[in-house]
Amino acid sequence: MDREFSETDVLSSAIFEPPLNSTSYESSCWRRRCVVAIPVRDEEQRLPACLSALAGQRDRRGRPLASDSFGIVVFANNCRDRSAYLARSLGGQFSLPLRVVEASLPPAKAHAGSARRRAMDVAEAWLGEERVRGGVILTTDADSRVSADWIATNLAAIDAGADAVLGDIALDEEGDLLPLALHRRGELESAYEALLTELSALLDPLDHNPWPHHATISAASIAITRDAYLAVGGLPRVPLGEDKALVAELVRLDRKIRFCPEIRVITSGRVEGRAPGGVADTLRLRSNDPDAFCDELLEPFRVAIKRAKWRGRLRWLRREGKLISNSAWARELGIPAPDAQRICRAPSFGAAWSAVEHKSPLFHRRLLKPTELPDQISGARRALARLRKGALAMREHVESEVVMPFRSMHPHSLTHCGDEQVCGLFAG
């Protein structure tokens, strides 16, 4: 993997390896298994709370983690304040193994995506230096505060088989100052996202990400194994949205992602942030324009159901080796035969599904306006109630006209019910 480092933009670095805190719980299983990467830009006001939360990490029994059980990388990029100085000072105060890298990035690279990639690259290299087996890279934001069991819960999910773990987020007390209309919109979006997430879990269940789970993708809480990080070539080189780009690449390679409901990070509710396109920009945009479009993942519920159902169908066909022999799926999705053949030859299901979404006219995304959310929520609730209640009947009823081409499919999956069963019944 090519690391984004050069002597032209790294001005200085300092490494701190303080002695063990005598009050910390020591266990050989925790010895420097993970490193937390934090990109920082002018965060002297919020960085102390971030590092304090990491200093207070405990295992799942509530015992303090040994101070040598994890490391922290602070990548201070283009800072005009005392962020780097404070990081060094707090590292000594909290007895944290801390590496502070100060960098002056050129304008073309002075963005959140590049800073986070560099921070995570330093974390990966640190694990490599110490030859850590099963090493894990975590990342959060300097304006965020993780829970006391954040590291332990992430590692538990990794130990359960995940290649990457995503945590949920909540706004801090600054979020209380946002307009009431924005809070109401946030409640509607959260409610609708939860409904779509459960619908997807029913129609395309994944063993490594069982229900319940969330669907939040935020760099405020990501954990990824070092092996997976190297496999995807590191954090994608994008100026913003690096968290979503990383998840997309993991999905493309069929890596196992757990959206862990037990992990929640408190992040800043400010509207003047440091990273263009980040949470602060989104909050400011929606405060200034209450009718701004919703996130692209909040699509009309009928399309979301169709997307999840077909994803589950095709996942099963590929797993059973029947994607090539059963060509009915391509005709129903409006995908030309040559494209379908290329999809069948894709190296992973994730790559195949990405091509399906690109080629099929059924899955073109339409952005929702916030005024549409109440009706979409009502429809999604009805659909979900039917799916929950009639799951057994739907599993047995797979001989409808729509699913006749799929008789050879597994009979015990909601993903093989026809469109009229999953969508059409919810019009009333």
List each model region and its residues.
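Active-site donor/metal-binding and catalytic loop motifs
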Residues: 255, 261-277
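Terminal low-complexity segments of carbohydrate-biosynthetic enzymes
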Residues: 285-428
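Conserved donor NDP-sugar-binding/catalytic core segment of glycosyltransferases
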Residues: 149-188
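A conserved acidic beta->alpha catalytic loop
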Residues: 73-86, 105-107, 144
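A recurrent flexible, glycine/aromatic-enriched loop bordering the glycosyltransferase active site
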Residues: 200-222
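Acidic donor-binding loop at a coil-to-helix junction in glycosyltransferase catalytic cores
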Residues: 240-246, 260
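Acidic donor-binding/catalytic loop of UDP-sugar-dependent glycosyltransferases
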Residues: 82, 133-135, 139-157
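N-proximal low-complexity "stem/linker" segments adjacent to membrane-targeting elements
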Residues: 1-69
